[in-house]
């Protein structure tokens, strides 16, 4: 797992990526990455957004969606250690990003 500290300031949660999610992050286009980065910084202050809560196997996870670009970022909030853990980042095509997130969630200790 890779850690990214929140920018200096009053951020409460730290950001971490699963290794596969970090690879996906690094492969993103610069403009998509910048948009997601800005949204993630806001989520580090308040990660529990009711409208972004997922269901089913991902019921303890949340999403950030970029409608125009078609990307989704799926994360889990670990309140006990104040961490936002990114599980997957990809296009929504065929729900692949959600399937990846479920698989990674099941294999994550």
Language-model segments: which ranges?
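Amphipathic alpha-helical interface surfaces
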Residues: 32, 36, 40, 50, ...
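Enriched for short, Lys/Arg-rich terminal
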Residues: 1-8, 12, 68-72, 76-109
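Arg/Lys-rich, positively charged N-terminal/basic patches that mediate binding to nucleic acids
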Residues: 1-39
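Residues that form or immediately flank small-molecule/cofactor binding pockets and catalytic motifs
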Residues: 20, 59, 91
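Short, intrinsically disordered, mixed-charge
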Residues: 30, 41-45, 107
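A short, surface-exposed loop/turn module that caps and links secondary-structure elements
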Residues: 41-66
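Conserved catalytic core of Hanks-type protein kinase domains
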Residues: 27, 43, 76
């Amino acid at each position: 797992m890779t850690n990214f500290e929140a920018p200096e300031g009053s951020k409460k949660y730290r950001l971490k990526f699963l290794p596969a999610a970090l690879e996906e992050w690094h492969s993103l286009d610069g403009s998509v990455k910048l948009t997601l980065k800005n949204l993630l910084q806001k989520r580090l202050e308040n990660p529990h957004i009711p409208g972004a809560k997922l269901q089913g196997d991902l019921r303890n996870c949340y999403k950030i969606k970029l409608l125009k670009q078609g990307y989704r970022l799926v994360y889990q909030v670990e309140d006990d250690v104040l961490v936002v853990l990114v599980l997957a980042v990809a296009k929504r095509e065929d729900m692949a990003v959600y399937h990846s997130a479920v698989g990674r969630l099941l294999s994550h200790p």
